[in-house]
Amino acid sequence: MERGKVFIVSAPSGAGKSTLVKGLIQLVSNLVFSVSYTTRQPRGQELTGREYHFVDRMVFEKMIEEDKFVEYAKVFDHYYGTARVSLEDVVEKGKDILLDIDTAGAAQVRKKLPDVVSIFIMPPSYEVLRKRLELRKQDNPETIQKRLQWAAEKEIYQYENYDYVIINDDFSQAMESMRSIVLAERCRKGRMTHRIQSIIKTFGGT
C-alpha cells in the first residue's frame, strides 16, 4: 500500500481557509482532516475532537517537552500544534491528511516532511480581508487590527514558500481549485507505483 500524502493549507486569518477545508473534506474521499491541539477556548459551536483538541497550557507544554508534535506555534497568545502520532496513523493507512496550520507551523512540517504539498489561500485584497474579519464577529476591533497587521507584515508574503496559491475571491472556484490540486497530486506516478505494476503484470510484464 502506498503511503498517504500530507497536504498543508495556510492563510491569513479571515481568508476563508477553514470553510474551504471543511468543504474539501466533504467533497474528496480518503482525505482526513488533521485535528490540531490548541490552548484557545472553543468558538461558537466548536467541539473538542472535531475542530480542535482543546487543552490547557500545562498539557500542551508537556506535549512539547515529550516531542509529541510534528509542528507547533504560538499565535496571538495561544498554542496550536499537530500531533505526530495522529499524522503517521493516517498516512500509514494510505489515506491523505489535510493540515490547517499557520505559516510558521507549515515551515516546520516542510523541514521534517519534505514531500508535503502546500497550498496558500490568499484574500483578494486587504480591504476584503478586513470586512470578512468584521463580519464573522469573533474578535473585538483591537484584535481585528492585530490580525490585519500580522497578515500585512508577516503572512501575506509567505505565499512564495508554497506549492500552490489560491485567491479566494469566489468560493466555488476556490473550492474547485483545491479539489483539482488534491486529485492531480494523487495521479503522480510515484503515488501509483503498486497499482501501475499490477496493471503491467496483466500485459505479461514484470
Model-flagged regions — what are they?
Residues 1-6, 29:
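Extreme N-terminal, non-catalytic leader segments
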Residues 10-12:
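P-loop (Walker A) phosphate-binding loop of NTP-binding proteins
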Residues 15:
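ATP-binding Walker
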Residues 18:
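Walker A/P-loop
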Residues 25-34:
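Post-Walker A helix-loop "phosphate-sensing" segment adjacent to the P-loop in P-loop NTPases
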Residues 38-97, 104-107:
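ATP-dependent small-molecule kinase phosphotransfer cores
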Residues 97-102, 111-136, 167-168:
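Conserved phosphate-donor/acceptor-positioning beta-strand/loop module used by diverse small-molecule
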Residues 138-206:
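Small-molecule kinase domains that catalyze NTP-dependent phosphoryl transfer to phosphate-bearing small molecules
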